[in-house]
Amino acid sequence: QIIKRHPEYKMDDRLLLHKINMEDGTITIEGATYPIDTSLFGSLDKDNPYELSPGEVHVMNSLKYSFANSSRLKKHVGFLYSKGAIYICCNNNLLFHGCIPLDKDGNFEVVEFDDNLYKGKSLLDYADKIARRAYYGEPNQNNLDFMWYLWGGKKSPLCGRNIKTFERAFIDDETASVEEKDPYYHYYLEEKIATMILREFKLYSDISHIINGHTPTLIGV
């Protein structure tokens, strides 16, 4: 439903429910057909696959209530918002969790939200602003939807890949769940790219570093 509300997210390829063939137990994704256990989709309305059934609405409302009324979760999330940020510049270093979206040529990827174009630092500033509005501001569906985009959007600085949760959960063929990474992960070890990113955030020291979360750590190496 979020994807349908926001064509600017450019995530129509993640609309998969209408591609399930309930008769022969398969799903076709990007031209490839895979077997799938259709018994797991007994409540799916093939005429309106992206509408929740009354029972599903009840489950979602119960989950929403539990999350919204968890005092411990409120405390933890409040701490993250009060102390954290999408990125931080500290001691001539740049700290961020995911990536700085790049295009295939290693330039900052330009993305459009709210009829404005963002790239590099301006994209992360925009993400931080909307995340805070979603938490502190009056209820706004667009802001809440953007929080979902930050989790799984192709050009989200917190994600950096074409996330395939559906394929991992329901398709046994592992080739279906290979996630295409943002070009950032191809370039990020190159000095000129690191320097370009640091300059974008007004960091010019010869001892500046990018401290990048969301990257695997090899144990015992």
Where do the model's predicted regions map?
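Feature recognizes metal-dependent phosphohydrolase scaffolds
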Residues: 1-221
